[in-house]
Amino acid sequence: VVLGKKGDTVELACNASQKKSTQFHWKNSKQIKILGNQGSFLTKGSSKLSDRADSRKSLWDQGCFSMIIKNLKIEDSETYICEVENKKEEVELLVFGLTANSDTHLLEGQSLTLTLESPPGSSPSVKCRSPRGKNIQGGRTLSVPQLERQDSGTWTCTVSQDQKTVEFKIDIVVLAFQKASSTVYKKEGEQVEFSFPLAFTLEELTGSGELWWQAERASSSKSWITFDLKNKEVSVKRVTQDPKLQMGKKLPLHLTLPQALPQYAGSGNLTLALEAKTEKLHQEVNLVVMRATQFQENLTCEVWGPTSPKLTLSLRLENKKATVSKQAKAVWVLNPEAGMWQCLLSDSGQALLESNIKVVPTWPTPVQPMALIVLGGVAGLLLFTGLGIFFCVRCRH
């Protein structure tokens, strides 16, 4: 038994006992001649394989009279007979085909179905291994639900029949962004860079996209930017005036926000609709903004944007332990000491964002000499007026 792959080439062996050229014939199960020889010439019969069958003439003088069948078809599955030296050798050929149900370019979350084509009467089994090492077994139909971006690559599938095996390689491309979600941490006023790299590469990439943004302070989301993608080049269609984003013209998709401000802190969803695909690619992006301020006798550290309840916000004087540290979005210190203070946002001891602010010492305001002169003059005038009134009243009495 020899197993072959649909569309591939197979070689059926036939050897003579002596290493010399002799007459041979290959026939199918209906005794119809496929090919043979006449001296040193290759002859062909009237079978359906006449245009796809061949033999290695260079090996005839070694007693090797194999038949090569190109572009195999499922219907080529049958028993073939080699007649040489007054003897017959039978070889059973079974041809299998393994194909994806619709397309080998699938969006993340979609299902992959592999269908096995097999000759009548066979009972093969299929075992496939994904690029991330996951094994899937099945019969004539093999289904893989909820594809992940790690499933992109070459799938190796082994078809087994009668203790023989044949291996298939199928390239699957999972259309997705490299990350499902990302968070950018910035101090107030800093420039913000958003990047959306794709987890796949294609020769031609055409589609359109949009970034919707839900600011933490806003009651509803709004579209920040829309764009087109053609031959891996990006062109902006529409962009808001506040904020006015800038977008790179080449892949990977790249957005720049001039300043990180509290009113922009929030979550966004970038969608990318590819040509000939009904569903869209998605990536979530978050922006967390930090502000450290001093007002009168109060030093405050605040963050805006989506943060985990487990994150810790702290304020500490340089080279000292934290004065205040808690799982909150705002902390403050009353009457802070003079020096450089650090506002720190951390996750399990790992710093995510920090901002430094210098607290200047406050001194009592000195009394100016001119103020003393004015106060003295006013006091003298009041005293003089009071004495005058006193003596006038006394004289009248």
From Swiss-Prot:
A lipid is attached at residues 392, 395 (S-palmitoyl cysteine). It comes from Cercocebus atys (Sooty mangabey). This is T-cell surface glycoprotein CD4. The gene is CD4. Residues 1-98 form the Ig-like V-type domain. Glycans are attached at residues 15, 269, 298. It comes from the Eukaryota. The Ig-like V-type domain mediates the interaction with MHCII. Keywords: Adaptive immunity, Cell membrane, Disulfide bond, Glycoprotein, Immunity, Immunoglobulin domain, Lipoprotein, Membrane, Palmitate, Repeat, Transmembrane, Transmembrane helix.
